[in-house]
């Protein structure tokens, strides 16, 4: 076994403890995540306008905010694209995934925060690797090289705008 695999195995063993907690207590983990997201969003303009408070219940959130379609959210996105901060996410949003334009035949911009890249994509990739390494202890997958391909992107007004794959590749911290 390589040194790299030994180090990764140690890291992944610790990560598997957290993953096992997610499996054993999904309701508790979901409630904790909801509270964190509500606390972060309460101080944005979207949060204030919709009465989002740090101690809001999921039921109250659903009643106050409801389901939002793209057109109702578009003015917030346009302001974030223009560089305004604390609109619908804390701070500045500098990453935007561009959709292929399936519903109205136009591209849509999806705000992507660096925090969401970390929690959803970086840690998600690490968790997938941890589960794989746990299931296949003799794997040599981490001894090789990888090739990652992404879509196109542009920089506008200090923001990175492009295919989700390009946005993720350019912003991910590699494992």
How would you label these PLM feature ranges?
Residues 1-98, 104-173:
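Nucleotide 5′-phosphate-binding alpha/beta core
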């Amino acid at each position: 076994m390589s040194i790299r695999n030994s180090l990764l195995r140690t890291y992944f063993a610790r990560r598997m403890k957290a993953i096992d907690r997610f499996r054993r207590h999904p309701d508790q983990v979901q409630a904790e995540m909801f509270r964190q997201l509500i606390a972060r969003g309460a101080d944005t303009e979207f949060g204030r306008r919709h009465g989002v408070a740090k101690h809001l219940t999921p039921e109250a959130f659903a009643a106050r905010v409801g389901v939002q379609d793209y057109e109702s959210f578009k003015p917030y996105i346009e302001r974030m694209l223009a560089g305004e901060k604390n609109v619908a996410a804390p701070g500045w949003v500098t990453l935007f995934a561009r959709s292929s334009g399936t519903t109205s035949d136009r591209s849509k911009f999806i705000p992507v925060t660096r925090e969401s890249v970390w929690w959803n994509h970086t840690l998600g990739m690490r968790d997938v690797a941890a589960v794989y390494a746990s299931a296949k202890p003799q794997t040599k997958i981490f001894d090789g090289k990888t090739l990652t391909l992404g879509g196109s992107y542009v920089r506008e007004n200090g923001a990175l705008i492009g295919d989700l794959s390009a946005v993720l590749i350019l912003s991910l911290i590699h494992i």
